[in-house]
């Protein structure tokens, strides 16, 4: 009797897990169709810039410094400017002082500087998954889209690097299960957060890549002392 009860309980858990998986897959398909319809109406030129790994669309505003090594060449820390909106255009969070002024969330005690995050070979959760995928994967661009923007000097296959600027239109499954909100002075428009299971638009600029952050910061401090002095004295 006890064994039968345990078997029934296990079967019930498997059934619940199967139902949850089917529900998630069903929602993903629905959201994909909804996001595609939104892109068709608002950004039809990006439909063929769809990235199958992650299910997002990309607009490349700047390919970046093609002499610089791509992020995906190595494991590194990435410094990147970042601003996020919902599909209605409301700013949810920003690292940019000009946008903070624009939406009335600017504070004098907030240091508006780029994010600084680790970007390894495997997704660790330190980045929004969609931004991680864009950094690590080769972006495939529609040849007609590339031809329509000769001033950007875009290749049809691009790996992000220093200077790259992109806009990502991401489904919620590569954004986060809990939605998005700004904090610590990086809030967007007052009263706006991104609810769970909602697409997210991210504008991102790659500012720098660093292999060893401590060594890099040490060099920056030394350079500041040498160049600006400011009464500072270096000690060995």
Region spans (language model):
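Sec-dependent bacterial lipoprotein signal peptides
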Residues: 1-19
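Cross-family detector of peptidyl-prolyl cis-trans isomerase
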Residues: 19-236
